[in-house]
Amino acid sequence: MTMARRSRLILGLLLLPGAAVAQAPRITPAGDPSVQSDSIYRLAVDPRDHPDESAVFLLDDGVIVVEADGRESRTFRQVVQVLKQSAVEGLAEHSFSWSPDNERFTLNWIRVVRPDGSVVSAGPAQQQESDVPAAMGAPVYANRKVLRVSLGGVVVGAIVDFSTTTVKTRAWVPGDFYQWWGVSTGLSVQRSRLIVDAPATESLRIKERNLNFPRQTTRAGDRQVLTWATGGLTQVKPEAYSADSNDVH
């Protein structure tokens, strides 16, 4: 299961042909050089301080690198602490999908650890890759793959840490790029980070909603790197009869 986000940030970009070198951290199955896992695990909370939550995000992270011709790399990492039994099943079962025609998917890692960093499970107990079948009601076939993963050792108090990278080898519409990101997830978030690395010559069309922290922009050579980073976010509780366009959700 990938924990759902609620959108607060939308990015849109139309790029022109060109090439550049990425400046974002290079994340591989060997790890993320910009994040120390032990420091993230130490952010584990006391469940008694979160009586209304079944889980909390210790880290919600995205690193996106786009090129002028529409190629892109998207790496997402989630580190989630289990607080209640009701969250165990969802965090023990995960599925990831991609289009093999123009995408390459990598499960960088998926593991279960304790708050002290000791490993409970270093990888999937079971995993299966298959085609996505066409729906019986409206049988429209799409060439997509799905990877289903089952984890062992997911119990209350454990931490599930996984990272995926999807590389778009060619764009259906050259130069098109769109991404949304939600800082608010519906759960408490200890650390949230989004990095977008794009050609410096391109004008990013950015729409931000209800952010109480500034983004950081740096330039290195012919690249621009935009970072949204914050932390200590408490759960946003829904309000009965509230409007769906209240700039919070």
Language-model segments: residues:
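Hydrophobic h-region of N-terminal signal peptides that target proteins for export
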Residues: 13-22
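Beta-strand-rich, non-transmembrane domain signature
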Residues: 23-249
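Bacterial N-terminal signal peptides that target proteins for export
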Residues: 1-11
